[in-house]
Structures are given as C-alpha cells and as structure tokens.
Amino acid sequence: VWLGDDLNKLILNSEGEYRHGDNRHNNEHDSATEEAELQLLYSRAITAYWNFQAGWRGDLQPTPERHWLALGLEGLAPWFIDVNATLFVGNEERTALRLGLEHELMFTQRLALVPEIELNVYGRNDLETATGAGLSDVTAGMRLHYEITREFAPYVGVHYWKQYGNTARFSRVDDEKTDGAEFVAGIHFWY
C-alpha cells in the first residue's frame, strides 16, 4: 500500500508465510505463522525509473523480533527487470542485504507469468533466529497472475528455496530442512 505521487511516496509493505501441515522448520504437522515482516518506507524518485527508499523493517516472526533501518534502491533495469536492492542495519551491529529480481512475461493484457529470485546476505551470525553470516538463503520461483482489474490480481505459483552457509548448518543442527519447494497463492493489490 502506498500514499503519495510519482515523486514522493510513503509505502507500507507486508509479507508473511503461514504454513498448514508439514512445517519446513521442525517437520511437525501444525499450522502457524512462520514468518512475518513489515516495512514502512519513504520513497523518492531519483530518475525516471529508479527510486531511493529509506525507512524501517520489522521482523515480527520468528521471535525474537528484529528491527532494522532500511536503505535501498528500487527500479526498472534494462530488459524490464524489476530490481529491489536494500541494505538493512539493525542493533548489535547487525547488517543484511536483500536483492530481488523479477520480470513480468505478459501472455495477454491480463495474464502474466512472473519469474523471480531473491537472496539474503547477513553480516553476522544471529543464533537466536538461526541466521548465519554470509549468503543465508535464495528463493527462486514463478507466479502466474490474472489481473481482474489493474489494481487487483490473484496469483498462484511455486517457489524453491535453499539455505546456505551457517544458516543451513544451524538448520541441520536443529534437524530442520535446508531446502524445499512450496506452492504459493495470494492476492496482489494496490489502490
């Protein structure tokens, strides 16, 4: 959700994962909110295709909560690749970098396939959240969405995720999965 104009925007992003049944973190058959992230960002256009963003990110799940200062660039690279690169700085000298890339392949005016990839890199180990320094995880996938209106598009898709380095080691020690595939469904909307 955003409020503003093409030059200045206030953006509220939320992302979460709710799992039903077989749980990738502990192989139990339960249902729970696995991950919840909220971002409040100020976005300023710096060129016709690029925005500078600054604000706050809160990792609300898994516990303990982590709060970060966010600084990033979001825009459209050549060949219509959407890029989102954000540096996060948290307390106790925590740092993170997230890079996301996606490209919309239009089949019709309303139906599109969106391949995407996202990677997360952390500056130090965080034992409480089982996050390791270095390349932590990569998620790659595809979403198929249908725009009922330009502002409202349900989607289905599949994602493959894999943990690396110390993050994978922490997961193996806790007898958790370090990779897997999952089906996703949701609604993309804006107003």
Q: Predicted segments — roles?
A:
Residues E65-D126:
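Detector for outer-membrane/organellar transmembrane beta-barrel domains
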Residues W2-S31, L40, R44:
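Outer-membrane beta-barrel initiation region
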Residues A32-L38, E65-L69, E93-L97, G132-V138, ...:
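Residues that define the transmembrane beta-barrel architecture of outer-membrane proteins
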Residues M142-E147, K177-Y191:
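Outer-membrane beta-barrel "beta-signal"
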Residues E15-Y18, D22-E28, G58, A70, ...:
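Extracellular loop and loop/strand-boundary signature of outer-membrane beta-barrel proteins
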Residues L12-G16, A54-G58, A85-V89, P115-V121, ...:
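Transmembrane beta-barrel strands of outer-membrane/channel proteins
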Residues L3-D5, R44, G75, V89, ...:
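Residue-level signature of outer-membrane beta-barrel architecture
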Residues L7-L12, A48-F52, W79-V83, T108-L113, ...:
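Repeated loop/turn-to-beta-strand initiation elements of outer-membrane beta-barrel proteins
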